[in-house]
């Protein structure tokens, strides 16, 4: 059992300097997230010209939300309705006719690492995002936006791969617990894989038109 807190951040919501924003197309990483850790990651390029704040924040583990513009052919794209098409003539049917069947961006909770990962002795700073959803297919080159809401812990070295995996799994639980509060949950839009609650967090940046 970890001695770290299972929730981070005040119940009142994110505090300055958060939220932080980051976006780009998903790139291939070191190839060890799924292979060695069983924790697949979607990487974004670290570009200080686009995200000048990234040079001044500590290396470590962060959490928040990611939005992905999955292509309509992707096997994990959410269905417009889990119960099938709405009955003709109902209010749901009218709303469905007005809204796109597949919105361009879908929101997921995420936990991410920004840093060098001392266990692997990386020489280049990376941004590795673990989307808290089980995907059946990759989504390289897909546009991804990040709304970073808080800091979980500093990065550190580990004596074993097992210790690293244990800490990452606990990071995921901390992220889920921390986001399962009214001020940390979206005010609009559906979060896939998150708690089913109506929150107050503005996530329009994740869903905006490009």
Give the predicted meaning of each segment.
Residues 2-210:
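Phosphate/ribose-recognition catalytic cores of enzymes acting on nucleotide-derived substrates
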């Amino acid at each position: 059992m970890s001695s770290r807190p299972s929730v981070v951040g005040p119940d009142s919501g994110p505090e300055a300097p958060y939220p932080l924003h980051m976006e780009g197309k998903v790139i291939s990483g070191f190839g060890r997230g799924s292979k060695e850790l069983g924790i697949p990651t979607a990487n974004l390029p670290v570009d200080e010209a686009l995200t000048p704040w990234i040079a001044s924040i500590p290396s470590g583990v962060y959490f928040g939300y990611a939005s992905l513009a999955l292509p309509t052919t992707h096997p994990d794209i959410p269905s417009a309705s889990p119960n099938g098409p709405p009955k003709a003539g109902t209010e749901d049917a009218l709303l469905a006719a007005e809204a796109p069947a597949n919105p361009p961006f879908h929101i997921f909770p995420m936990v991410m690492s920004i840093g060098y990962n001392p266990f692997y002795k990386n020489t280049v700073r990376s941004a590795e995002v673990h989307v808290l959803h089980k995907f059946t297919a990759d989504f390289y080159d897909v546009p991804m936006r990040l709304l970073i809401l808080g800091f979980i812990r500093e990065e550190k070295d580990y004596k074993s791969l097992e210790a690293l995996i244990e800490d990452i799994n606990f990071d995921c639980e901390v992220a889920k617990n921390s986001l399962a509060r009214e001020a940390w949950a979206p005010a609009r839009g559906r979060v896939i894989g998150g708690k089913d609650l109506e929150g107050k967090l503005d996530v329009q940046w994740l869903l905006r038109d490009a």
